[in-house]
C-alpha cells in the first residue's frame, strides 16, 4: 500500500515572464507550504498564489462552495468588511507565525478600489536566521464571485553598510 503524501496540494505554473510559481487552493495548504519553506531556509525567495473561499463564507455555506451566494463579492460592504477582518486578524498573523517572525506587523499597507475589484497591499521587512527579506502580500476580491486571490512574494534584502 502506497504511503499518502501529507504535504500541501500545489499546482506549479510558469507565468508570461518565465517565473515559476506555486498555486494553492486551500488556506491550510498555503500556510503549511510557507511553514515548510521557512524550516528549510528557503523563505527569502518565494512567489506563490492562493485562490480560496474565505473561511467565514465556507462556514455559512456549510463547507459547500456551490451554496455561496453570488452577492458575496467586492460590491457587498458586509463581504468586504468580513474579508478585511479575516485578512488582518487571521491571514497576516498566521503568515507571521509560519515565518517565525512575530515582529512582522505589515504596517506598510494600502488599498486600491475600482468597480472590478478591491486590492489590499501589505508590505513589511523581516529577518530570520540573520537573513533579511521583504514580504509583500496582495489580496484581491473581484466583482464577479467570492473567490479571493492572495499573491505572496518574498525577496532577499541587503543591509546597507
From Swiss-Prot:
It is a peripheral membrane protein. One of its GO terms (cellular component) is plasma membrane. One of its GO terms (biological process) is energy reserve metabolic process. Keywords: Cell membrane, Membrane. It is found in: Cell membrane. The keyword Acetylation does not apply. Disulfide bonds: none annotated. Belongs to the RGI1 family. Involved in the control of energetic metabolism and significantly contribute to cell fitness, especially under respiratory growth conditions. This is Respiratory growth induced protein 1.
Amino acid at each position: 500500500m502506497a504511503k499518502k503524501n501529507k504535504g500541501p496540494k500545489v499546482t506549479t505554473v510558469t507565468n508570461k515572464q518565465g517565473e515559476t510559481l506555486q498555486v494553492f487552493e486551500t488556506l491550510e495548504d498555503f500556510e503549511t507550504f510557507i511553514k515548510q519553506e521557512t524550516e528549510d531556509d528557503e523563505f527569502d525567495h518565494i512567489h506563490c498564489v492562493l485562490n480560496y473561499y474565505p473561511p467565514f463564507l465556507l462556514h455559512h455555506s456549510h463547507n459547500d462552495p456551490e451554496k455561496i451566494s453570488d452577492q458575496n463579492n467586492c460590491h457587498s460592504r458586509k463581504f468586504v468588511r468580513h474579508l478585511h477582518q479575516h485578512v488582518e486578524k487571521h491571514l497576516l498573523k498566521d503568515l507571521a507565525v509560519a515565518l517565525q517572525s512575530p515582529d512582522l506587523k505589515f504596517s506598510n499597507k494600502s488599498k486600491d478600489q475600482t468597480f472590478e475589484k478591491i486590492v489590499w497591499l501589505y508590505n513589511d521587512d523581516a529577518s530570520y536566521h540573520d537573513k533579511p527579506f521583504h514580504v509583500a502580500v496582495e489580496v484581491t476580491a473581484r466583482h464577479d464571485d467570492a473567490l479571493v486571490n492572495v499573491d505572496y512574494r518574498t525577496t532577499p534584502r541587503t543591509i546597507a553598510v
